[in-house]
Amino acid sequence: PVLENIVYFYAKSHDYSISVGRIGKLECDFILRDHKMNYAYVQVAYTIALSKKTEDREYKSLESIRDNYPKYVMTTDYLLQNRNGIKHVNLMDFIISNSTF
């Protein structure tokens, strides 16, 4: 929950509206919406590098979303692996560079 809280407060500090999403039995940690009605979907995990099962779980819910808004898996990993158009980003690098979703 600590990393999720960091992402939540970071998104709030950039004026995103935040909700949690459900896609069938799957859950998306955050659905973010900016003031221009642009969306982004975010999954947060400490690491996906140690377990293929964890990696698949984090990507699966995002892969089931069929629109073209950006999708992110945010972790503390430094070996990043994008998959099916979903961006795998290092959480701390994202925040330090003051990136937006």
Residue ranges and their predicted role:
Residues 1-101:
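A cross-kingdom feature that marks ATP-driven nucleic-acid transaction machinery
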